[in-house]
């Protein structure tokens, strides 16, 4: 199972949607086409922790009407870390629009 699919699986991560998926994978520097089983244990722990943390941040930012200010990769053109152009494709079984940096996000 790809990490981009696992994050959108509501039985695994209830409430996580496409924006959170893109932002969490960028925060932990994991390529969306990485298989969950290929993640090192440390990255798997980061995935779970960041999905939870970002979900709470997301809700607070949404309530304050400042959500878009906090997007680092979702609907952006350049990576905020390296300045390279972000990749955009419809990935996973759900074919959801996915943004990522091919330089900063590692495929395991």
Predicted feature descriptions by range:
Residues 1-108:
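Basic, nucleic-acid-binding surfaces and adjacent catalytic neighborhoods in DNA/RNA-processing proteins
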């Amino acid at each position: 199972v790809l990490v981009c699919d696992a994050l959108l699986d509501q039985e695994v991560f209830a409430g996580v949607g496409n924006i959170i998926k893109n932002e969490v994978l960028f925060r932990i520097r994991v390529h969306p086409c990485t298989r969950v089983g290929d993640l090192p244990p440390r990255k798997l722990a980061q995935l779970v922790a960041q999905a939870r943390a970002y979900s709470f941040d997301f809700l607070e930012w949404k309530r304050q009407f400042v959500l878009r200010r906090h997007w680092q990769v979702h609907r952006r053109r350049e990576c905020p870390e390296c300045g390279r152009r972000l990749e955009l494709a419809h990935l996973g079984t759900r074919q959801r629009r996915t943004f990522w940096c091919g330089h900063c996000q590692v495929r395991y």
